[in-house]
Amino acid sequence: MANIPLLQCIQLTKYYQRANFLIKVLNCITLSIQSNEMIAVVGASGSGKSTLLHLLGGLDKPTEGEIFFEGHALHKLTDNERSVIRNKRLGFVYQFHHLLSDFDVLENVAMPLLIGGIAFNQAKSRAQCVLELVGLKNHINSFPHELSGGESQRVTVARAIVNNPSLILADEPTGNLDQKNSDSIFQLLKKLNTYYGTTFLIATHDLDFAKKCHKILMISNGKIKLSQNDSFR
């Protein structure tokens, strides 16, 4: 029997009303993502990469089409219902880390757990374990302004995985990093994928980064083309 997809969209369409005309960003996209996959999403600026991630992550609703995540029909859920799923089963990493400046690294990473109602000591213990996993055990009491760009992005990754999500959606996670830090972040994501089974969908302009993923999803003119990367490394 075929594996049930972790995430699936069927005939997904998204357009925006602008004055007297419509801007169609995504047009009848059908896509299935299996557990443990690491997929890069590439395309020109404005092609719809971020829009696709927002829809698949339940941050926005499609104009038409269906989205299923772990058996949940996201397109049918209320905003509050989608919010609960996002906090418990999804992780997000962005180009800009959006760390809370008044909180230290440990508190920033623990925040999703605290929002989810986890006890303070349990949340901090889990956050500390995750920070050790991403190589930041010596920075748990540091504040965001004391971190380098690469360290800040590692904190963002730690915050994204602290709830042990089955899927992480990353939007240009290395966009503000130099090549050395970009390579370091990729190796971190690959480790999480290989050893912990985390599934990744990563929007990127970096074709070298994309070529290191299992599959590459190209968006152009609102359509997608998915290719297998046989040289995954």
From Swiss-Prot:
SMART domains associated with the record: AAA
Function, as annotated: Part of the ABC transporter complex LolCDE involved in the translocation of mature outer membrane-directed lipoproteins, from the inner membrane to the periplasmic chaperone, LolA. Responsible for the formation of the LolA-lipoprotein complex in an ATP-dependent manner.
Quaternary state and interactors: The complex is composed of two ATP-binding proteins (LolD) and two transmembrane proteins (LolC and LolE).
Gene Ontology MF terms: ATP binding; ATP hydrolysis activity
Domain ABC transporter: residue ranges: 7-233
SUPFAM superfamilies assigned: P-loop containing nucleoside triphosphate hydrolases
GO cellular component, one term: plasma membrane
UniProt main location, coarse: membrane
Keywords, ordered alphabetically: ATP-binding, Cell inner membrane, Cell membrane, Membrane, Nucleotide-binding, Translocase, Transport
InterPro entries: AAA+_ATPase, ABC_transporter-like_ATP-bd, ABC_transporter-like_CS, LolD_lipo_ATP-bd, MacB-like_ATP-bd, P-loop_NTPase
Source species of the chain: Blochmanniella pennsylvanica (strain BPEN)
EC number(s) given by UniProt: 7.6.2.-
EC class of the enzyme, as a word: translocase
Descriptive protein name: Lipoprotein-releasing system ATP-binding protein LolD
Compartment(s) of residence: Cell inner membrane
UniProt KW Nucleotide-binding keyword: yes
Entry superkingdom: Bacteria
